[in-house]
Amino acid sequence: MVHWGEVKRMKIEVRGNQVILDGYVNVVDRESRMLPSPRGYFKERIVPKTFEKALKKAKNVDLLFNHDKNRNLGSIENGNLELYEDNIGLRAIATVTDEQVIKKARNKELRGWSFGFVSEKDSWEEGESGVQKRSIEELELLEVSILDMTPAYVATSIETRGENTAMIEMRSEEAAVKTVVEDDTEERSTLIKQIKKVLEGN
């Protein structure tokens, strides 16, 4: 049995001049909380294997900071982002060398994951109390983001792509962040060794 609290965890390891982030960007087959839209409030779930199909089609997926295209932290192509769907959802493992992100990781200011996508196939049905339910069956995964702000689960933006206009949707959720600063121990043991050397020299 998978506990949701465990799934929501973002594990962060600070190792010298890099930080390794590991966690679930989204859990599949789980109904979201109520989301706003022009057609009223709705609940949403992503069908299992949707991310798997998206990753097979994707030439690349970028890793951004707060969905900011000017703050590109890497990508699958770059080799510092690994994405895959397992029986829980979309898992991300990222190695980041950006100084600002490392500093925020040390200060425990990182809040969770988010992802940007274009829906390619979805279905709607009437749920309980007239609440619409949306199932996303196919999507184009554009990017995953590391957040340092409390996520607003749902957001959208309009982008012109070639001759077409696409609605890019963003989904995020705050994670229970667990930070391990490994290099503190290394620095301490190095310092102890240096002190011992000095004492032995005397």
Q: At which residue positions do the language-model features occur?
A:
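Signature of dsDNA virion morphogenesis modules
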Residues: 1-170, 178, 182
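Terminal short linear interaction segments
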Residues: 175-202
